[in-house]
């Protein structure tokens, strides 16, 4: 067993039906921020002591959290109010909101250019509402909107190539947007499995990991865009995280409620741990090799140590 259960962090009860979504860790303060969508709040966990700290309120339908350690910033995608939030970890009261497209979800950040991409899931009843919003994070201003062919999922930024990768659920694609020209889609990568959902990048070996609704994990070469391998999963995945030090990949699967861990050197499955039905999202503390699986029914986080 690679993933050892250390215990649980009790989180606030759900105010409305639902649960949690994307999470991110700020290294310097050892704070984990998780979108508690059911509560319109960002819950904050102390990763050193694995205990709940407090919640940041009034983030309607918050769906995602992203941290820039380089710029000391935290971003939120507030799907219920069509805004993104921006604040410094030591100044939560200074949280600023920027209007973006319809129902923002995925977030990725280019620290070199201060450019935030918000991937908007849109509304099927509103024509042309599947978009990407590009935001100047330092000036708190949306600078451009890019129409895309379908519902967006997660997104990541590749610092070496200076490009954003964005999953599109249908048609199954990864879109490429460059920092140099953040007003259009530069390239489209066809994905050989329906429903690209979770996405992460191995910046050293230049590989993209794309977890698809069709219970498949697709591995691509980031520069050539070629598909290298496809792996069957035990269910439809959502959030994934790549551990750059141990070179492990973690995949959250809400049904049946498991986390699968892979060795990315040979893509061998290392472990499968039971979480809870509906537990589709994770947080990863790279400093301590700890994984947090968010359990919606019992409103808590299961904490695992990756023993390598």
Language-model segment annotations:
Residues 1-308:
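Predominantly soluble domains enriched in secretory-pathway, periplasmic, or organellar proteins
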């Amino acid at each position: 067993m690679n993933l050892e259960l250390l215990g649980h962090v009790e989180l606030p009860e759900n105010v409305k039906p639902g649960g949690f979504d994307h999470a991110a860790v700020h290294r310097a303060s050892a704070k984990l921020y998780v979108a508690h969508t059911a509560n319109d709040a960002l819950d904050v966990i102390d990763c050193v002591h694995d205990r709940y700290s407090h919640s940041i309120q009034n983030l309607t339908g918050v769906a995602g959290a992203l941290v820039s350690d380089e710029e000391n910033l935290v971003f939120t995608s507030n799907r219920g109010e069509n805004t993104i939030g921006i604040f410094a970890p030591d100044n939560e009261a200074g949280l600023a909101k920027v209007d973006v497209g319809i129902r923002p979800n995925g977030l990725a950040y280019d620290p070199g250019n201060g450019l935030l991409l918000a991937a908007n899931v849109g509304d099927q009843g509103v024509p042309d509402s599947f978009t990407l919003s590009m935001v100047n994070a330092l000036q708190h201003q949306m600078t451009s909107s890019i129409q895309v062919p379908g519902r967006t999922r997660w997104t990541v930024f590749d610092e070496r190539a200076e490009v954003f990768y964005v999953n599109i659920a249908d048609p199954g694609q990864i879109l490429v947007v460059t920092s140099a020209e953040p007003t259009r889609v530069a390239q489209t990568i066809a994905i050989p499995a329906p429903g690209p959902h979770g996405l992460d990048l191995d910046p050293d070996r230049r590989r993209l990991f794309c977890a698809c609704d069709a219970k498949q994990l697709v591995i691509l070469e980031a520069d050539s865009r070629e598909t290298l391998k496809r792996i069957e999963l035990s269910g439809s995945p959502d959030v994934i995280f790549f551990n750059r030090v141990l070179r492990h990949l973690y995949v959250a699967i809400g049904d049946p409620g498991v986390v699968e861990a892979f060795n990315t050197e040979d893509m061998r499955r290392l472990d499968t741990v039971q979480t809870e039905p509906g537990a589709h999202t994770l947080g990863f503390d790279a400093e301590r090799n700890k994984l947090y699986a968010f359990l919606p029914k019992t409103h808590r986080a299961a904490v695992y140590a990756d023993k390598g």
